[in-house]
């Protein structure tokens, strides 16, 4: 034993190790016992271009937010990690970030990697969400190992989302945080999760256009441009015209001002920030519990039948698949009375998930500081769940965070679709539409227009006024492909409605009557 200690900690051994460490440092290498690269010169070369973040994790070069929508970003594990855990995280802008972590990494380790990658400061409002084998969504617990929480994987797929919707968006200090909130709300509205009235939807869509495109310039921008964006499900042409008219009223707003106006408008929606959970009552009927910053909403179908404010809830407990709420209410004489409500869920796992979400919402929005008091009872005889809220509250997030002097980020453009005129033109002209999609707009996502089964996709329509139509003559070199000289596209000079009659007649002939097409210089008639 003494021989081992002298060999390891003796003066000569320490001097020899110091000389070796100095040589490795000059060569840009490191000892794996110190967290240096493993695998020889190749590993050292690959890690030399990746600056290490605090904690020994390796991040992409640059360190700041790499908002490359739709791209894939890889974050390597630290050099000392032998076994790695592979996780895929999808950000709000569409970026997929793959992270390698140690085998026994906790949720906090993965969350720290993501917020460091994004250069996000106000992290308390966000979380990582995943689906279990029963397709039930769960929030990743930062205090527990990832492998113990996620049973589907590897690779483990998670989504970076807003977990706590701020009750007052003006308290969000950073512009980047407000931008992420806008992305989350746009996704909620487009997916149908967040319902909003018609007028509110028009205003929110107009603010999105102002933030992304800037001023509405009438010669350049038309109502047809609005149809290239998607704001709500089942978007109509009449709504797009109203959005365009409202867009013109927001002249002068910067992107940051437009996004703040968006949040201040969206916060008044009835279902803003509501986390819905399906339960069953004592009568066996299905209800929905909505967790909000002010309390718990009760829905029967689409009708709101009750609201339990957080200060009125004195007890919230669960046992197996049964959730119990004790609420204090004033009777007609002003005396307080306790009412007990019992709800049942499909399984004990979903019941505990609802209870945890309710505890987290109550602690985040109602408390100034989380209660860290430990029970006097021994852990050996302790009953119930060990879960305790360990994050920061909204009060701490708004009063304790320090504002940065400067921060820069990139706003990603929205997904664009062909305009309505383009889609209508494509339905009647398959060849020209294919040329438009491949040449004029290579990155525009295609519609699925109404298709006529009796017309070959590569065969252009033959028109009476143009007997020799070919693939080459449809799109000439001296003018864009979208220009068309057919008579029914031109406005009638008389203005007596003959133009409309001609269009109806041509459409009827094309759909029901006989027409001719040319294919490889051969005239074919299809009945």
UniProtKB/Swiss-Prot annotation:
Location in the cell reads:
Cytoplasm; Cell junction, Tight junction
Report, as the record phrases it, the tissue specificity of this protein: Expressed in mouse liver cells, with lower amounts in lung, kidney and in 7- to 17-day embryos. Expression not detected in adult mouse heart, brain, spleen, skeletal muscle or testis.
Q: What is the effect of changing residue 385 to A?
A: Abolishes in vitro phosphorylation
Keywords, alphabetical? Cell junction, Cytoplasm, Phosphoprotein, Tight junction
Listed GO biological process terms: actomyosin structure organization
Which is an annotated GO molecular function term of this record? cytoskeletal protein binding
Q: Name the residue ranges with Basic residues bias.
A: 413-424
SUPFAM superfamilies registered for this protein in UniProt: PH domain-like, Second domain of FERM, Ubiquitin-like
Residue ranges of domain FERM in the record: 85-369
Q: How is it modified after translation?
A: May be negatively regulated by phosphorylation.
- For region Disordered, the annotated ranges are 23-47, 400-425, 453-482
GO terms for cellular component: apical part of cell; bicellular tight junction; cytoplasm; cytoskeleton
Composition bias of kind Polar residues appears in 467-476
- Tell me the Pfam families matching this sequence: FA (PF08736), FERM_C (PF09380), FERM_M (PF00373), FERM_N (PF09379)
Q: Give the main location.
A: cytoplasm
Quaternary structure, from the entry? Interacts (via FERM domain) with ARHGEF18 (via C-terminus); the interaction activates ARHGEF18.
Q: What does the UniProt record say this protein does?
A: Up-regulates the activity of the Rho guanine nucleotide exchange factor ARHGEF18. Involved in the regulation of the circumferential actomyosin belt in epithelial cells. Promotes cellular adhesion, migration and motility in vitro and may play a role in wound healing. May have a role in mediating cytoskeletal changes associated with steroid-induced cell differentiation.
Please report the name of this protein according to its UniProt entry: Band 4.1-like protein 4B
* Species in which this protein is naturally found: Mus musculus (Mouse)
């Amino acid at each position: 034993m003494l021989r081992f200690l002298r060999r390891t900690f003796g003066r000569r051994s320490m001097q020899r190790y110091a000389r070796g460490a100095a040589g490795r440092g000059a060569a840009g290498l490191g000892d794996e016992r110190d967290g240096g690269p493993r695998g020889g010169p190749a590993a050292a070369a690959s890690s030399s271009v990746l600056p290490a973040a605090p904690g020994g994790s390796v991040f992409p070069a640059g360190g700041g937010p790499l908002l490359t929508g739709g791209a894939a970003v890889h974050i390597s594990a630290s050099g000392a990690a032998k076994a790695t855990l592979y996780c895929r995280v999808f950000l709000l802008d569409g970026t997929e970030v793959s992270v390698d972590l140690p085998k026994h990494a906790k949720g906090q380790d993965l969350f720290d990697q993501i917020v460091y990658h994004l250069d996000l400061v106000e992290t308390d409002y966000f979380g990582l969400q995943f689906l279990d084998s029963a397709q039930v969504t769960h929030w990743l617990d930062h205090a527990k190992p990832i492998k113990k929480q996620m049973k589907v994987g590897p690779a483990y797929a998670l989504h970076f989302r807003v977990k706590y919707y701020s009750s007052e968006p003006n308290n969000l200090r950073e512009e980047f945080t407000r931008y992420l909130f806008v992305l989350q709300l746009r996704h909620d509205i487009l997916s149908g999760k967040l319902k909003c009235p018609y007028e509110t939807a028009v205003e929110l869509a107009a603010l999105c256009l102002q933030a992304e495109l800037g001023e509405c310039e009438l010669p350049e921008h038309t109502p047809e441009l609005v149809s290239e964006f998607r704001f709500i499900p089942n978007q109509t042409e009449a709504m797009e015209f109203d959005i365009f008219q409202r867009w013109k009223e927001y002249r002068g707003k910067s992107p940051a001002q437009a996004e703040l106006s968006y949040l201040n408008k969206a916060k008044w929606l009835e279902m803003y920030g509501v986390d819905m959970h399906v339960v069953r009552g004592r009568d066996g009927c299905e209800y929905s519990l909505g967790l909000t910053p002010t309390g718990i909403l009760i829905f029967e179908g689409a009708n709101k039948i009750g609201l339990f404010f957080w200060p009125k809830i004195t007890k919230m407990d669960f046992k197996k698949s049964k959730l119990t709420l004790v609420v204090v209410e004033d009777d007609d004489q002003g005396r307080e009375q306790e009412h007990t409500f019992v709800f049942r869920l499909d399984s004990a796992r979903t019941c505990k998930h609802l209870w945890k979400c309710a505890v987290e919402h109550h602690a985040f929005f109602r408390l100034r500081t989380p209660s860290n008091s430990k029970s006097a009872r021994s852990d050996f005889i302790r009953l119930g769940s060990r879960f305790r809220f360990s994050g920061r509250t909204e009060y701490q997030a708004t009063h304790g965070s320090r504002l940065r002097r400067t921060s820069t980020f990139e706003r990603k453009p929205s997904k664009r679709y062909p305009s309505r005129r383009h889609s209508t033109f494509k339905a009647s002209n398959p060849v020209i539409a294919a040329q438009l999609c491949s040449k004029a707009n290579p990155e525009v996502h295609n519609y699925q227009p109404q298709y006529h089964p009796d017309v070959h996709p590569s065969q252009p329509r033959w028109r009476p006024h143009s007997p020799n139509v070919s693939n080459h003559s449809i799109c000439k070199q001296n003018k864009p492909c979208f220009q068309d000289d057919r008579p029914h596209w031109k406005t009638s000079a008389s203005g007596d409605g003959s133009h409309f009659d001609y269009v109806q007649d041509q459409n009827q002939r094309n759909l029901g009557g006989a027409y001719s097409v040319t294919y490889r210089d051969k005239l074919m008639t299809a009945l």
